Design a protein with these regions (language model features):
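Residue-level detector of beta-strand structural context in well-folded domains
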Residues: 4-5, 23-25, 114-116, 120-122, ...
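Structural motif
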Residues: 32-34, 58, 129
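Short charge-dense sequence patches
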Residues: 1-4, 101-102, 126-130
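Conserved beta-strand hairpin/beta-sheet module of binuclear metal-dependent hydrolase folds
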Residues: 2-50
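Active-site HxH/HxHxD metal-binding segment of metal-dependent hydrolases
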Residues: 41-125
Length: 130
């Protein structure tokens, strides 16, 4: 699909690389799907993802760097660890002008939980550096 390299790893699990060399994963559960990171390829990412699943797609960001969250504004539910939310609001390590342009949706904290049960088929483990 237009610059994306998609590998189906298992039923309901895809590894996706964009043409900029960024990797992401789409995991499909019973009622919804979860994308882990978004990459930075130009254009919209949701049309490509919707060709893989018809379920609503939430986004989990591994951390607040632009190459992981560029398309976050396309998602209604975006999750990020609370420490990265603080870094995001403080501008730590970010090019804020670019980040503010591409990321306008609200983010939800995974809280201090170490296991983030979003889908029925897996648990996403939330890890933050100390």
């Amino acid at each position: 699909m237009d610059g994306y390299e998609i590998e189906k790893i298992d039923e309901g699990l895809w590894a996706i690389d964009d043409k900029m060399g960024c990797s992401m994963y789409l995991v499909e559960g019973k009622n919804k799907a979860l994308l882990v990171d978004t990459g930075v390829q130009e254009g919209k990412i949701l049309p490509m993802l919707k060709s893989l699943t018809d379920k609503p797609i939430s986004l989990a960001l591994t951390h607040a760097h632009i190459d992981h969250m560029y398309h976050a504004d396309e998602f209604e539910e975006v999750y990020l660890h609370e420490r990265d939310i603080k870094a995001w609001h403080g501008g730590v390590g970010l090019c804020m002008s670019l980040a503010q342009l591409c990321f306008t949706s609200s983010i939800r904290s995974t809280g201090s939980r170490s296991i983030f049960p979003l889908l029925t088929r897996l648990s996403l483990i939330s890890v933050a550096s100390r």
